Swiss-Prot record:
It comes from Sodalis glossinidius (strain morsitans). Pfam families: DsrE (PF02635). It comes from the Bacteria. This is Protein TusC. Belongs to the DsrF/TusC family. InterPro entries: DsrEFH-like, Sulphur_relay_DsrE/F-like, Sulphur_relay_TusC, Sulphur_relay_TusC/DsrF. Keywords: Cytoplasm, tRNA processing. SUPFAM superfamilies: DsrEFH-like. The gene is tusC.
């Protein structure tokens, strides 16, 4: 079985990487059973609740991350160091219940995947 990892490294606004990655993730979930999703660097910002993209005339796609469990995508990881660097902690309000990992731990988990797609 092919294990596929999606790594989100860009924030929710400013470019389309997050939205395109989410679209690819949802499409792939129909074809693959073992998918891991990693949020690192500015990618951790994708999971923050209470975003107001309409204020900058952007589409609100972040809430769609909340439906990943309906697609049986349950291996969700957030880089604790990336969150801390941005002044965020577990109480910040998140759209997903991702497992918080140190940089070393998420690198180890990521190495177990056959294919890695970065957005």
């Amino acid at each position: 079985m092919n294990r596929i990892a999606f790594v989100f490294t860009h924030g929710p606004h400013g470019d389309a990487a997050g939205r395109e990655g989410l679209d690819a993730l949802l499409a792939t979930s129909a074809l693959a059973e073992d998918i891991g999703v990693f949020f690192i660097a500015d990618g951790v910002l994708l999971l923050l609740e209470q975003q107001q993209p309409a204020q900058i005339l952007a589409r609100d796609f972040v809430a769609t991350f909340g439906v990943l469990s309906l697609y049986d995508v349950d291996s969700l990881y957030l880089c604790a160091e990336s969150a801390a660097e941005r002044g965020l902690d577990a109480d910040a309000g998140w759209v997903l219940n991702a497992e918080w990992l140190s940089a070393a731990d998420w690198r180890q988990r990521l190495s177990a995947y056959d294919t890695v797609m970065t957005f």
